[in-house]
Amino acid sequence: MIVRNEAHIVHEVLDCVAPYISTWCIVDTGSEDGTQEIIRAHMAGLGIPGELFERPWKNFGHNRTEALQLAAGRADYIWIVDADDLVIGTPDFSQLSADSCELRYGPPDGFTYWRQQVFRDGLPWRYGGVVHEFIQCDQPFQIQRLLGDYHLESRRLGGRNLDPEKYARDRDLLLVEVERDPEDSRSVFYLAQSYFDLGDFANARRWYQRRAEMGGWEEEVYYSMLRVGESMLRLEEPWPLVQDAFLRAWESRPTRAEALHAVACYYRQQGRFQLGHIFAQRAASIPVPPDDILFVWAGAHSWAALDEQAVCASNLGQHSEAFSIFRNLLAGDKLSPEDRVRVAINRDFSVPTKLEIATAYPAVGIHTTRPRSDADVTVTVSCGPNPHNAEATLNSVLNSCTDRSRISRLVVDDAELSEADRTALRHRYPLAQSLDAPFREPAAARLRRISEGIQTRYWLHIPADWRFFAPERLLSRLARVLESEREVLAAGVNFEDASELTGRNAEEAIVRRGAGTGRYVLTDMMPRGPVMIDMERLGKIGGVDSGAADVHGDLTARAIAAGLRTATLDEVLCVYVG
């Protein structure tokens, strides 16, 4: 490592690399903030031997090479890091066998690139370039890529990155290099990068174009062509020319999605949703290229193009497509907290259409569907006095539970309906059975009566006037949550026991996942909305108390006393309309 004025941050990278190293060699190039003593003291505290050298600054290529030479003979491999790097996860170096090893920078679903950072000792390694240096060797060498659940985060917080003139200094150094060697494609590329980072998009476009025309490394050519399009877009050049630049970039490397995503994004912003949808759908079909190493925005492949496709589909009235994509994005872990809120809100725009579909009478299969021999869920639905609302609730349940063959019995608490309406309901829903209960029975007594008729392991209770709208294997999902969490009494359908669309999801830190569960969270309150209860665990706390003034509060208190918790799915799948 080479350092200069890194006192504010260097201890973090030292802590990160400590578990993996047996010695260290750090070159200070002129720190004036005490970096030298901080490093010596910190490594002594970690109990790792090593040596700090002080050498004058010349340029990145020279000083990196000097550091490599000073580290020679100390270990089997030399790991080059920067003072502001962090190691996220746990890299496994135990299988190192090649002469050089590439490490992943950036999270797997973010902006990712691979860099050679680990080198076998004893080979004639050196760095070239005055800035944006690159490794060279005077003899052939083998490279391997270190895969695994880790990445390095280059935080741009070191002394050099705090210099407001950093990009201008890089530009000036690279201009000298390009003048010295006009065919130095790497210097041309990073000169274009420096202009882009400075916001000088006219010069960035010029130098990216020059780099693209030089040919050579296909990934660098592609990225230069992509940046030509991005520079033209920032310069507000005519869209047909900008689009042509993006499409030429994609045509040069059709395994990359960034250019098509940029085109889709533009059309969506312009309200031209048909075209946006076409380009987004094509971009979303491209998997993350497994072998590319240069500035891969994996998010364009894994979620951002899908996001654009769903927004366009929603605006085109293709709500089933939009709803499905948004739900899949929310079910994953690729979205930032800010994007998760936005995607959840966008998903909810399609809910009115989904409700209209879900509450329609399920004519197909309603008279022929029979429970499986191993059906293990009893569904109970409470009804108010309005037969239309009762039918809408039943329709939404039957349409949304695509695994309804798991229903052993469908019991309808229809005491508040007229006799004529009850007869009509039984005719329209042959699977439904009426609950034999008196009119206007207290809530706790009614729930106790319902629970006493449950003969299955799982009980899904749906209070009156709820509407489901998301087709899925809901019964199986709720049951899997209860199977996965042995200390959970009940699993609610809606996050935060919401009764309306909220656009909210749980923070990633508290989300749980299991096979077939999707995202869910643990809570300590018995849901008042639709909920699946484990009847064995309900029996262990004495069942429903028919005399409780607040039946949900009573169940919550007794569950907590017995060491049981509750859970909810991490989304809203039904709404209350009463």
Per-range role (PLM):
Residues 61-68, 75-81, 85-206, 216, ...:
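Catalytic-site signature of metal-activated, phosphate-bearing donor transferases
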Residues 16, 20, 27-43, 56-57, ...:
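A conserved acidic beta->alpha catalytic loop
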